[in-house]
Amino acid sequence: MANVMKAPKRQLTYVTDLNKCIGCQTCTVACKKLWTTGPGQDFMYWRNVETTPGLGYPRNWQTKGGGYKNGELQKGKIPPMIDYGIPFEFDYAGRLFEGKKERVRPSPTPRSAPNWDEDQGAGEYPNNSFFYLPRMCNHCTKPACLEACPNEAIYKREQDGIVVIHQDKCKGAQACVQSCPYAKPYFNPVANKANKCIGCFPRIEQGVAPGCVAQCVGRAMHVGFIDDTNSSVHKLIRLYKVALPLHPEFGTEPNVFYVPPVLGPRMELPNGELSTDPKIPLAQLEGLFGKQVRDVLAILQTEREKKMKGLASDLMDVLIGRRSADMMISPLT
């Protein structure tokens, strides 16, 4: 029998403008320092920023399966530890304090790690391209992890829609790891329990923005309640309709959205003429965000041109985000 989920009264929602993410990993570090420094969590990055196109973290997560197909829950694959990157250490003490002459090398020898292919992208100069894709738990409206859990350990908080794993109820079945198509629940081998992003709900309860959002130096992130018509997330998703979920075909109805990137045209054709083709192939963006991305790119281009001509654009003002308080719940860190 499928687990019964009560619809939340409100839904906390995130938007990231991929045109402003600079790949600095400040959000990654903020999340890591706050939540995953315990035993068995070395390899976990509840929040990570990966280069797209690329293998991602864990490797090849986009092909692991899970989610829903025709409304039916799908079983995916549990990524092996090598796909996350086996944690490694450096023998600094031996070199600095014990007189060892060998070079300081990581042990064990790393074969994979988060951002293993950072900044590689695709294509050849001068038309090579990539962009940064920050990822976290999507706190889905239809979370596959919740339905898959055999111990009813996963629930969606009534007050904010954040999806949480009840640690006392979790028995380490890993059904959530297997069923999430975004590979965002992690199995803690020390605690024998699943861990995942908790949406910084202790901060939300105090009226403070999540750590990843508050620390974003590129001012790329927005967070708020989708029913708040004054919030930037409501405006970007519902009013201007320029923010889209990642892989909507997975069927979980994510509550993390993205403003797709605009990188401009390719540099030159072989005959020396300028190209009108976009540097990022449209098919690539459609593969990530669905067919609607074409309309969104057209809206962004129109509004950008208005702003360049000195005309007013409410949408661009929201995206620029001159005041942190307009982009999020209290930005206090």
From Swiss-Prot:
Binding-site list for [3Fe-4S] cluster: C149, C170, C176
Annotated ranges, domain 4Fe-4S ferredoxin-type: 12-40, 128-159, 161-190
Entry's cofactor comment: Binds 1 [3Fe-4S] cluster. Binds 3 [4Fe-4S] clusters.
Chain positions recorded as [4Fe-4S] cluster 1 binding sites: C21, C24, C27, C216
Keywords from the named record: 3Fe-4S, 4Fe-4S, Electron transport, Iron, Iron-sulfur, Metal-binding, Periplasm, Repeat, Transport
Binding of [4Fe-4S] cluster 3, residues: C137, C140, C145, C180
PROSITE patterns (UniProt xref): 4FE4S_FER_2
GO molecular function, one term: metal ion binding
Biotechnology: Has potential use in bioremediation of waste sites contaminated with perchlorate, a common component of solid rocket fuel which is a widespread environmental contaminant in water systems in the United States.
Cofactor(s) needed by this chain: [3Fe-4S] cluster; [4Fe-4S] cluster
Location in the cell: Periplasm
Summary of the function given for this chain in its UniProt record: Component of the perchlorate reductase that catalyzes the reduction of perchlorate to chlorite and allows anaerobic growth on perchlorate as the sole electron acceptor. The beta subunit may be responsible for electron transfer to the catalytic alpha subunit PcrA.
Subunit structure: Heterotrimer of alpha, beta and gamma subunits.
Protein name per the record: Perchlorate reductase subunit beta
Lineage: Bacteria, Pseudomonadati, Pseudomonadota, Betaproteobacteria, Rhodocyclales
